[in-house]
Design a protein with these regions (language model features):
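Intrinsically disordered, low-complexity boundary segments flanking structured domains
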Residues: 12, 41-46
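Intrinsically disordered, low-complexity segments enriched in polar/charged residues with Gly/Pro
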Residues: 1-3, 43-45, 88-89
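Charged, low-complexity, helix/coiled-coil-prone segments
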Residues: 27, 35, 74-76
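Intrinsically disordered, low-complexity, charged/polar segments
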Residues: 47-106
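Residue-level recognition of conserved beta-strand positions in structured domain cores
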Residues: 25-27, 59
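Short, solvent-exposed secondary-structure boundary/capping segments
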Residues: 32-41
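Mixed-charge, Lys/Arg-rich low-complexity intrinsically disordered regions
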Residues: 1-13, 18-22, 29-32, 103-106
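Broad hydrophobic/π-residue packing in well-ordered secondary structure
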Residues: 21, 43, 54-55
Length: 106
């Protein structure tokens, strides 16, 4: 099994290519690592390949905040410089510089 190099990094702010939400990456799976039930719930015509990085996001849209699991092929960098308003931001990240969040060094 070979792993693909991730395009995005922890702390990057990204947006979805097809749906109206954005978020900050807090974890990366270098290939699909969720349930088969979750995977099959995605409509077949938009179901992503499993052999690519998948990202865990603290996500938001105009109405709510939530956590999302998104394939690399469906993400773009978000260069808006707008902060993410997710309530867990301060638990995971210690600050923001430019368009990326960072974790405090131990």
């Amino acid at each position: 099994m070979s792993f693909q190099k991730a395009k995005f990094s922890i702390g990057d702010v990204v947006k979805h290519k097809h749906f109206e939400f954005r978020g900050v990456i807090y974890d990366v799976d270098f290939e699909f690592n969720n349930s088969e039930e979750w995977y099959q719930s995605i409509p077949k015509n938009v179901r992503p390949r499993k052999d690519q990085p998948f990202y865990h996001l603290l996500a938001e849209n105009d109405e709510i905040t939530y956590e999302a699991y998104v394939s690399e092929q469906n993400l773009l960098f978000d260069d808006s410089d707008e902060p993410i308003k997710h309530p867990l931001i301060e638990e995971i990240f210690s600050g923001k510089k430019g368009s990326s969040y960072f974790k405090q060094s131990n």
